[in-house]
Amino acid sequence: MDNTIENMINSIDLSAPVPEYEPMRQYYYLKACRQIVKAKEERLKRPLKAVVSTFGCQMNARDSEKLLGILKDIGYEESDNEESADFVIYNTCTVRENANLRVYGRLGQLKKAKRNNHEMIIAMCGCMMQEPEAVEKIKTSYRFVDVVFGTFNIFKLAELLYNRFTSNEQIIDIWDSTKEVVEELPTSRKYPFKSGVNIMFGCNNFCTYCIVPY
Protein backbone atom coordinates (compact mmCIF):
# COMPACT_ATOMS: atom_id res chain seq x y z
CA MET A 1 0.00 0.00 0.00
CA ASP A 2 1.06 3.60 -0.64
CA ASN A 3 3.12 4.84 2.31
CA THR A 4 1.30 8.17 2.19
CA ILE A 5 -2.05 6.45 2.70
CA GLU A 6 -0.64 4.31 5.52
CA ASN A 7 0.77 7.37 7.25
CA MET A 8 -2.58 9.14 7.00
CA ILE A 9 -4.41 6.13 8.46
CA ASN A 10 -1.92 5.87 11.31
CA SER A 11 -2.41 9.56 12.10
CA ILE A 12 -6.13 9.08 12.72
CA ASP A 13 -7.32 9.48 16.32
CA LEU A 14 -10.24 7.10 16.85
CA SER A 15 -11.24 8.95 20.02
CA ALA A 16 -11.91 12.08 17.96
CA PRO A 17 -15.15 12.71 16.03
CA VAL A 18 -15.48 10.94 12.68
CA PRO A 19 -14.11 13.21 9.92
CA GLU A 20 -16.75 14.65 7.60
CA TYR A 21 -14.62 14.84 4.47
CA GLU A 22 -13.15 12.16 2.24
CA PRO A 23 -10.83 10.36 2.17
CA MET A 24 -10.09 11.09 5.85
CA ARG A 25 -13.50 9.70 6.78
CA GLN A 26 -12.64 6.36 5.18
CA TYR A 27 -9.20 6.36 6.79
CA TYR A 28 -10.98 6.60 10.14
CA TYR A 29 -13.12 3.56 9.36
CA LEU A 30 -10.18 1.62 7.94
CA LYS A 31 -8.34 2.04 11.21
CA ALA A 32 -11.43 1.19 13.26
CA CYS A 33 -12.07 -1.96 11.21
CA ARG A 34 -8.45 -3.04 11.64
CA GLN A 35 -9.00 -3.16 15.39
CA ILE A 36 -12.24 -5.12 15.06
CA VAL A 37 -10.76 -7.67 12.64
CA LYS A 38 -7.68 -8.11 14.84
CA ALA A 39 -9.88 -8.75 17.88
CA LYS A 40 -11.91 -11.32 15.94
CA GLU A 41 -8.74 -13.11 14.84
CA GLU A 42 -7.46 -13.25 18.41
CA ARG A 43 -10.79 -14.65 19.61
CA LEU A 44 -11.02 -17.25 16.82
CA LYS A 45 -7.27 -17.99 16.86
CA ARG A 46 -7.08 -17.90 13.08
CA PRO A 47 -6.87 -15.34 10.25
CA LEU A 48 -10.07 -14.04 8.68
CA LYS A 49 -10.55 -14.84 4.99
CA ALA A 50 -12.30 -12.78 2.31
CA VAL A 51 -13.53 -13.55 -1.20
CA VAL A 52 -14.33 -10.90 -3.82
CA SER A 53 -16.36 -12.43 -6.68
CA THR A 54 -16.64 -10.31 -9.81
CA PHE A 55 -19.44 -10.56 -12.34
CA GLY A 56 -19.38 -8.61 -15.60
CA CYS A 57 -17.18 -6.00 -17.20
CA GLN A 58 -13.70 -4.55 -16.81
CA MET A 59 -15.08 -1.70 -14.71
CA ASN A 60 -16.32 -4.24 -12.18
CA ALA A 61 -12.92 -5.93 -12.24
CA ARG A 62 -11.28 -2.57 -11.52
CA ASP A 63 -13.73 -1.86 -8.69
CA SER A 64 -13.06 -5.31 -7.24
CA GLU A 65 -9.36 -4.43 -6.99
CA LYS A 66 -10.39 -1.51 -4.79
CA LEU A 67 -12.69 -3.67 -2.69
CA LEU A 68 -9.99 -6.28 -2.16
CA GLY A 69 -7.45 -3.58 -1.33
CA ILE A 70 -9.70 -2.25 1.43
CA LEU A 71 -10.37 -5.73 2.80
CA LYS A 72 -6.67 -6.62 2.86
CA ASP A 73 -5.87 -3.32 4.55
CA ILE A 74 -8.22 -3.99 7.44
CA GLY A 75 -6.77 -7.45 7.96
CA TYR A 76 -8.57 -10.00 5.80
CA GLU A 77 -6.57 -12.54 3.81
CA GLU A 78 -7.65 -13.19 0.23
CA SER A 79 -9.26 -16.57 -0.45
CA ASP A 80 -11.01 -18.27 -3.35
CA ASN A 81 -13.20 -20.52 -1.19
CA GLU A 82 -16.55 -18.86 -0.61
CA GLU A 83 -17.92 -21.56 1.67
CA SER A 84 -15.14 -21.22 4.25
CA ALA A 85 -14.64 -17.45 3.97
CA ASP A 86 -15.53 -14.98 6.71
CA PHE A 87 -16.43 -12.24 4.23
CA VAL A 88 -17.87 -12.73 0.75
CA ILE A 89 -18.78 -9.88 -1.57
CA TYR A 90 -20.45 -10.17 -4.98
CA ASN A 91 -19.66 -7.29 -7.32
CA THR A 92 -22.65 -7.78 -9.58
CA CYS A 93 -23.50 -7.20 -13.24
CA THR A 94 -26.97 -6.73 -14.65
CA VAL A 95 -26.47 -6.52 -18.42
CA ARG A 96 -28.67 -9.58 -18.86
CA GLU A 97 -31.32 -11.08 -16.61
CA ASN A 98 -29.38 -14.34 -16.57
CA ALA A 99 -26.60 -12.56 -14.66
CA ASN A 100 -29.08 -11.73 -11.90
CA LEU A 101 -30.29 -15.32 -11.74
CA ARG A 102 -26.70 -16.55 -11.37
CA VAL A 103 -26.20 -14.26 -8.39
CA TYR A 104 -29.41 -15.43 -6.69
CA GLY A 105 -28.32 -19.04 -7.20
CA ARG A 106 -24.92 -18.39 -5.66
CA LEU A 107 -26.57 -16.61 -2.72
CA GLY A 108 -28.64 -19.71 -2.04
CA GLN A 109 -25.45 -21.73 -1.69
CA LEU A 110 -23.92 -19.11 0.62
CA LYS A 111 -26.92 -19.30 2.95
CA LYS A 112 -25.97 -22.88 3.80
CA ALA A 113 -22.34 -21.90 4.39
CA LYS A 114 -23.37 -19.06 6.68
CA ARG A 115 -25.27 -21.49 8.90
CA ASN A 116 -21.96 -23.27 9.53
CA ASN A 117 -19.90 -20.10 9.97
CA HIS A 118 -21.62 -17.49 12.10
CA GLU A 119 -18.73 -15.10 11.50
CA MET A 120 -19.52 -14.94 7.77
CA ILE A 121 -20.56 -11.56 6.40
CA ILE A 122 -22.13 -11.41 2.94
CA ALA A 123 -22.11 -8.21 0.89
CA MET A 124 -23.60 -7.23 -2.46
CA CYS A 125 -22.57 -4.30 -4.63
CA GLY A 126 -22.41 -3.28 -8.28
CA CYS A 127 -24.90 -2.60 -11.05
CA MET A 128 -27.51 -5.12 -9.96
CA MET A 129 -27.90 -3.24 -6.69
CA GLN A 130 -28.91 -0.10 -8.64
CA GLU A 131 -32.16 -1.89 -9.51
CA PRO A 132 -34.83 -1.13 -6.88
CA GLU A 133 -36.47 -4.49 -7.58
CA ALA A 134 -33.25 -6.38 -6.89
CA VAL A 135 -32.63 -4.53 -3.63
CA GLU A 136 -36.19 -5.20 -2.51
CA LYS A 137 -35.77 -8.89 -3.30
CA ILE A 138 -32.58 -9.00 -1.22
CA LYS A 139 -34.39 -7.32 1.68
CA THR A 140 -37.33 -9.71 1.61
CA SER A 141 -36.01 -13.04 0.30
CA TYR A 142 -32.29 -12.91 1.19
CA ARG A 143 -32.30 -11.34 4.62
CA PHE A 144 -29.09 -13.16 5.51
CA VAL A 145 -27.22 -10.70 3.23
CA ASP A 146 -25.50 -8.24 5.56
CA VAL A 147 -24.38 -5.28 3.42
CA VAL A 148 -25.84 -3.87 0.19
CA PHE A 149 -24.48 -0.92 -1.78
CA GLY A 150 -24.35 0.19 -5.39
CA THR A 151 -21.91 1.55 -7.94
CA PHE A 152 -21.47 5.10 -6.67
CA ASN A 153 -20.12 4.41 -3.17
CA ILE A 154 -17.64 1.57 -3.60
CA PHE A 155 -15.17 3.65 -1.61
CA LYS A 156 -17.38 3.37 1.51
CA LEU A 157 -16.79 -0.36 2.05
CA ALA A 158 -14.86 0.11 5.31
CA GLU A 159 -17.53 2.45 6.70
CA LEU A 160 -20.37 0.10 5.76
CA LEU A 161 -18.52 -2.88 7.18
CA TYR A 162 -17.89 -0.99 10.42
CA ASN A 163 -21.61 -0.23 10.66
CA ARG A 164 -22.35 -3.93 10.21
CA PHE A 165 -19.78 -4.92 12.83
CA THR A 166 -21.19 -2.52 15.40
CA SER A 167 -24.94 -2.83 14.75
CA ASN A 168 -25.44 -6.47 13.71
CA GLU A 169 -28.15 -5.23 11.33
CA GLN A 170 -28.56 -5.38 7.56
CA ILE A 171 -26.85 -2.31 6.07
CA ILE A 172 -28.30 -0.91 2.83
CA ASP A 173 -26.77 2.21 1.26
CA ILE A 174 -27.76 2.87 -2.36
CA TRP A 175 -26.96 6.18 -4.08
CA ASP A 176 -28.74 7.37 -7.22
CA SER A 177 -25.82 9.58 -8.23
CA THR A 178 -22.79 11.39 -6.89
CA LYS A 179 -20.27 14.05 -7.82
CA GLU A 180 -17.79 12.67 -5.30
CA VAL A 181 -14.85 10.60 -6.53
CA VAL A 182 -12.64 9.12 -3.80
CA GLU A 183 -9.53 7.44 -5.21
CA GLU A 184 -6.91 7.72 -2.45
CA LEU A 185 -7.67 4.30 -0.94
CA PRO A 186 -5.88 0.93 -0.81
CA THR A 187 -6.00 -1.12 -4.03
CA SER A 188 -4.93 -4.70 -4.68
CA ARG A 189 -4.00 -5.04 -8.34
CA LYS A 190 -4.71 -8.45 -9.83
CA TYR A 191 -1.97 -8.19 -12.45
CA PRO A 192 1.47 -6.55 -12.10
CA PHE A 193 1.64 -5.71 -15.80
CA LYS A 194 -1.74 -4.09 -16.45
CA SER A 195 -4.38 -2.02 -14.71
CA GLY A 196 -7.74 -0.45 -15.48
CA VAL A 197 -8.29 3.29 -15.81
CA ASN A 198 -11.77 4.53 -14.94
CA ILE A 199 -13.39 6.70 -17.61
CA MET A 200 -16.62 6.96 -15.61
CA PHE A 201 -17.94 6.10 -12.17
CA GLY A 202 -21.26 4.62 -11.16
CA CYS A 203 -24.20 3.96 -13.47
CA ASN A 204 -25.72 6.55 -15.81
CA ASN A 205 -28.71 4.31 -16.70
CA PHE A 206 -28.34 4.80 -20.46
CA CYS A 207 -26.50 1.74 -21.77
CA THR A 208 -28.89 0.36 -24.39
CA TYR A 209 -27.90 -3.29 -23.79
CA CYS A 210 -28.51 -3.24 -20.02
CA ILE A 211 -31.67 -4.17 -18.09
CA VAL A 212 -31.32 -1.32 -15.56
CA PRO A 213 -34.28 0.93 -16.43
CA TYR A 214 -33.73 4.52 -17.53
Where are these regions (language model features)?
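Proteins enriched for Cys/Gly/acidic motifs involved in redox and nucleic-acid/cofactor modification
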Residues: 2-214
